[in-house]
């Protein structure tokens, strides 16, 4: 089934590039050469490598996964990755499914046995690498095959997508996926904090306010947040600001100072230092290099990875 998936991606992407939403929540990626220090922001997703190997830093956790292995991410997390060995003859290939919390919540209502036990345990780390079982691979094959038939895509697509979510909930990472979508569970409280940070990243960080919103003491909130994301709240906010600033410069053509102030920096020099520390180059030079001669896949990947 892995070979069938690989062939389906090659048929859809005969050249280097990235396709978003050929089916709902689906993205396909092909790189024909190495990629270094690509910064991205991960939505909740399952990403399966079909050719090559990917080295990623997701949140604060390093992960390496190759052909036949998948990474499952339960929360919105900043990240970076590189691909060492890829060529036109042996391209890096991957597919990803963006996880839909509405589907997960619906499944937890229909199958309450998948809900986490309300025992007050700590939140779980939100990233895992695993080999997908045959039933998920089979569902992915059927989902990609449905791309080629508008009728099947419309009728069978939603059912197969829901099936993929259900099978993931049954798997090793299902407990964490259920945790972040179950009201009052520790993971759900951290999800509340992540959403607040994403909506208010340009404001001064107020741990007391976030702790109150998550119904946790500040010390408990810090511990749980780091357990789930492998980052402190301050580190998470900084990554949000820098990724959004890069997007503003790359997509909306804002200047360095305007982007820095838009995301909450009062000091442009501090912004430039922290930007270079994360992205490896000064803001203006980094954006210039990304907009001149970059592939479509590279341009997309430096902003968002779903």
Question: Residue ranges of each PLM-predicted region?
Answer:
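A short, N-terminal "cap"/entry segment at the start of jelly-roll beta-barrel domains
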Residues: 1-22, 26-29, 35-36, 120-125, ...
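Amphipathic alpha-helical segments enriched in hydrophobic/aromatic residues interleaved with Lys/Arg
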Residues: 5, 104-163, 167, 179, ...
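N-terminal regulatory/effector-sensing and dimerization cores
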Residues: 18-117
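Residue at a beta-strand N-cap/secondary-structure junction
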Residues: 55, 204, 253-254
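Short, structured loop/turn "capping" segments at alpha-beta junctions
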Residues: 118, 154, 172-176, 189, ...
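Basic/polar phosphate-binding segments, predominantly the helix-turn-helix DNA-binding elements
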Residues: 163, 167-173, 180-182, 186, ...
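Short, amphipathic alpha-helix enriched in basic
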Residues: 192-203, 230, 244-251
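…primarily DNA-binding HTH/wHTH and HhH modules…
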Residues: 247, 251, 255, 262-306
């Amino acid at each position: 089934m892995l070979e069938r998936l690989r062939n389906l991606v090659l048929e859809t992407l005969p050249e280097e590039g990235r396709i978003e939403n050929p089916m709902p929540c689906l993205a396909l990626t092909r790189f024909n050469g190495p990629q270094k220090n690509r910064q991205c922001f991960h939505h909740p997703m399952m990403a399966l490598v079909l050719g090559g190997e990917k080295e990623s830093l997701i949140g604060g956790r390093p992960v390496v996964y190759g052909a036949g292995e998948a990474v499952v991410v339960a929360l919105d997390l900043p990240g970076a990755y590189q691909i060492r060995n890829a060529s036109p003859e042996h391209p890096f290939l991957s597919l990803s499914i963006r996880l839909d919390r509405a589907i997960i919540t619906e499944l937890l209502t229909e199958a309450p046995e998948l809900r986490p036990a309300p025992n007050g345990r700590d939140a779980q780390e939100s990233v895992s690498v695993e080999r997908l079982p045959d039933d998920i691979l089979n569902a992915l094959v059927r989902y990609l095959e449905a791309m080629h038939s508008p009728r099947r895509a419309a009728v069978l697509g939603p059912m197969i997508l829901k099936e993929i979510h259900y099978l993931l909930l049954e798997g090793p990472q299902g407990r964490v996926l259920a945790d972040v979508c179950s009201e009052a569970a520790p993971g759900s409280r951290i999800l509340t904090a992540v959403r607040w940070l994403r909506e208010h990243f340009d404001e001064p960080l107020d741990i007391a306010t976030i702790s109150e919103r998550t119904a946790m003491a500040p010390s408990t909130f810090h511990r749980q947040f780091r357990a789930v994301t492998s980052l402190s709240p301050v580190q998470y906010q900084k990554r949000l600001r820098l990724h959004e600033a890069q997007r503003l410069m790359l997509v909306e053509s804002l200047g360095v100072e305007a982007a820095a102030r838009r995301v909450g920096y009062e000091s442009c020099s501090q912004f430039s230092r922290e930007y270079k520390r994360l992205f490896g180059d000064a803001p203006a030079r980094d954006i210039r290099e990304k907009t001149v001669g970059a592939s479509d896949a590279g341009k997309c990947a430096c902003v968002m990875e779903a």
